UniProtKB/Swiss-Prot annotation:
Region forming the signal peptide: none
InterPro entries with a match to the protein in the record: Herpes_UL14
Keywords: Host cytoplasm, Host nucleus, Phosphoprotein, Virion, Virion tegument
Region spans: Disordered: 159-219
Ranges of Pro residues composition bias in the record: 186-202
Modifications after synthesis and translation: Phosphorylated.
GO cellular component: host cell cytoplasm; host cell nucleus; viral tegument
Keyword Phosphoprotein recorded: yes
Role this protein plays: Contributes to the nuclear transport of the viral transcriptional activator VP16 during the early phase of infection. Therefore, participates indirectly in the regulation of the immediate-early gene expression. Additionally, seems to be important for efficient nuclear targeting of capsids.
The family this protein is said to belong to: Belongs to the alphaherpesvirinae HHV-1 UL14 protein family.
Compartments, record wording: Virion tegument; Host cytoplasm; Host nucleus
Name the UniProt record assigns to this protein: Tegument protein UL14
Amino acid sequence: MSRDASHAALRRRLAETHLRAEVYRDQTLQLHREGVSTQDPRFVGAFMAAKAAHLELEARLKSRARLEMMRQRATCVKIRVEEQAARRDFLTAHRRYLDPALSERLDAADDRLADQEEQLEEAAANASLWGDGDLADGWMSPGDSDLLVMWQLTSAPKVHTDAPSRPGSRPTYTPSAAGRPDAQAAPPPETAPSPEPAPGPAADPASGSGFARDCPDGE
């Protein structure tokens, strides 16, 4: 018989014994409630059967408890054995970590790595095109700022200060020649002189009045 079948049979017998003990106990109590004398054979038979079922139930319960405790202890031992096996396998797989000289080798490796990191930082600092001082005030140097100002001055439009102006007229702008701030602006165009009136007889003062002269010719 397998282990599972044996456990099932034990549980079934325990359940049957428990049911039988309850039936005989109920019969005994019923007879007692009905006033049957304890000397009555019916009461004696029911009581003895209930007592026997009760004792059997107690014995089976204790047996089941002992078996259960043994099973629990065996489980604890099994767990401990499995734990030890797992620890042994783990240490075997990592036995190189158990070397007493491993700590010294780790310290030496850390020192080598630190030295290599410092060498890398020095190489990066030497290869950098921009030093920390050049970037302290921004990426533009003072010379770059001066160059930008010069570009702005040469590209700005220039105002003619010698051109005649009239009320409401717009100022005349012209870019500087050849892009140089010191170049002279083109001179303004010359104005043609007004023509003089043609010579002729003197104007008659009376002609301006609009009246014809009454005097005949020769007077």
